[in-house]
Regions:
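Bacterial Sec-dependent N-terminal signal peptides
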Residues: 2-27
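Surface-exposed loop and turn segments in beta-propeller and other repeat-based domains
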Residues: 29-41, 83-92, 179-219
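Residue-level detector of Asp-centered blade-edge/turn motifs that repeat once per structural unit
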Residues: 51-55, 101-104, 146-150, 227-230
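Blade-loop segments of beta-propeller domains
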Residues: 75-113, 138
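Short, conserved, GDST-rich strand-edge loop motifs in beta-rich repeat architectures
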Residues: 109-117, 156-172
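Beta-propeller blade signature
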Residues: 119-129, 168-180
Length: 233
């Protein structure tokens, strides 16, 4: 950002000149720089990345392992594996679904075993890789993101049913309040208020088709976007 000022004899000293609106480019150009190979083909061994610009590290969800691979990208042309974070310290037989990085912290979304049980979010120090804390959220947290101001961490809890639909958890969004390096509060928003409008929603084109499923059971959130002022998601 740049600021400029000058003296003025005008009576309209309070006038504000709006900066030009940012223009989103129609395309971007990408140039190959380097590659890390997990050595596993077609098994989702490199699924979701997050970059730590301070330590020059790349965190990657390795869905084949159900863990997070940590790469040293100091030499960007030749990133190397230096560590792997598992969910074992949080829950037995749990697997990692997603990650997010912000301000020196790595957040990890963890799916419980079975996946229909409530999952977890874990917070790590991105430098030491120390587990700072964890909290229980809704079933099958499938994506998570920090708010722009860093005060909140939100997870989209997909809540998929098991194979025979004998257990069908509700979809939900969990909102974790953060203070420094601690998770201090967890609130979970469900879609239960829409259950009474099931027929209305179906007529409007909303797909609700699970066997005997309520609206909140059939809605399976996968992604979250947050406003720049961190007030709306």
């Amino acid at each position: 950002a740049a600021l400029a000022g000058c003296n003025s004899d005008s009576d309209n000293d309070d006038a504000v000149v709006e900066p030009p609106a940012a223009v989103t480019p129609d395309s971007i150009n990408l140039s190959f720089l380097g590659r890390y190979s997990a050595g596993i083909f077609a098994e989702s061994a490199a699924e979701i990345p997050a970059f730590d610009p301070v330590n020059k590290r790349i965190f990657i969800v390795n869905a084949q392992k159900g863990a997070v691979d940590v790469l040293d990208a100091t030499d960007a042309a030749n990133p190397t594996l230096i560590d792997t974070l598992t969910a074992a310290d949080v829950a037995a037989d749990a697997v990692v679904n997603s990650i997010a990085y912000k301000g020196g912290y790595l957040a990890v979304a963890i799916e419980a075993s079975p996946k229909t049980d409530n999952g977890f979010v874990a917070l790590y120090d991105a430098t030491t890789l120390e587990l700072l804390g964890s909290a229980q959220v809704g079933a099958q947290p499938d994506m998570l993101t920090f708010s722009p101001d860093g005060q909140y961490l939100l997870t989209a809890n997909e809540g998929e049913p098991n194979n025979d639909y004998s257990v069908d958890p509700v979809g939900s969004i969990s909102i974790l309040s953060l203070t420094d390096d601690e998770i201090v509060e967890v609130r979970t928003a469900t879609f239960s208020s829409f259950n009474a409008r099931r027929d209305e929603l179906i007529q409007a084109g909303v797909r609700i088709f699970g066997p005997n499923a309520s609206v909140e059971q059939d809605l399976e959130p996968e992604y979250i976007a947050i406003s720049e002022d961190s007030t709306t998601a």
